[in-house]
């Protein structure tokens, strides 16, 4: 899925060029609106928007990146709320992606997209709260 209809057409063309003849459902939708296609946990693989695809990210003339922060906060909330038990793989040139999502990656694999350094981050989504409680001081 992608918010851009052009990306859907491009993806379908690339699947055909790759010889993938079976139908893969593609739809135009905002990332925050996705829902699991089944009750059985699976895998999500995505290349989330960054740079010019998300608006202002990486523009040194802009101090804060509210658009990107809002997008990744909403995406993270969607993944946490709807995809417990799923493995989520995000491919990005933004090496600070786990921090933006406020998620701890289970694994990160380095790749290059041409000269652009990227990572494939794996997140194992869990139900509920995954932070450990801080140690409480012993009473005297």
Please report, for each region that a protein language model flagged, where it lies by residue.
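Class I S-adenosyl-L-methionine-dependent methyltransferase catalytic core
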Residues: 1-140
